[in-house]
Regions:
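Structured, acidic catalytic/metal-binding patches in enzyme active sites
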Residues: 1-170
């Protein structure tokens, strides 16, 4: 079993002997989402699930003490508060989580392994639509907890965007 990371910078050397051995010996690859090359379908699903009219402003969906960090995060991402006017809380959290992330999803280990397994079986745990539907069905309180966690983590991520990559590569 190999846990993957979804985005890495160009030219990162992640193929250790252990990963090479596991990948060559495996006849099955299990990933979260197998159709990672279909960005348009994932975007359509995200848009369809993530929009609802009549939502409170995003800042009001957080405790007061996190609102300055939310404002700073949105500023770093070039996002105006009005852009989230009809965005469900879970979708805002996923969008905001990408702001300080480093690396390129095109360099994700999951994508590389899926391409390598083109003649072997690839199975997905959820798939893109099902994974987004899980977030969409979360009660609002859990969505707000997710948003709060993203905002709290953004302070550390802004200071050290590569920390998750270093941890995975270690």
């Amino acid at each position: 079993m190999v846990g993957t990371i979804h985005a890495l910078p160009d030219f990162v050397r992640w193929r250790s002997p252990a990963i090479e051995s596991a990948a060559s010996a495996a006849d099955l690859l299990v990933v979260e989402i197998a159709a990672l090359d279909d960005d348009a379908a994932l975007a359509r699903t995200f848009t369809g699930l993530s929009r609802s009219p009549g939502l409170p402003p995003l800042a009001e969906r957080l405790p007061r003490d996190l609102r300055p960090a939310l404002a700073a995060l949105m500023d770093r991402g070039g996002i105006a508060p009005a852009q989230f006017a009809e965005t469900e809380t879970w979708a805002a959290a996923l969008t905001l989580a990408r702001i300080d992330a480093s690396g390129d999803p095109a360099n994700g280990v999951d994508r590389a392994l899926i391409a390598e397994f083109k003649d072997r079986r690839v199975r997905e745990l959820e798939g893109g639509a099902a994974q987004l539907a899980i977030f969409d069905r979360l009660p609002e309180a859990q969505q707000r907890a997710m948003l709060a966690a993203v905002v709290k983590d953004s302070v550390a991520a802004a200071k050290d965007p590569e920390r998750l990559q270093r941890a995975w590569l270690a």
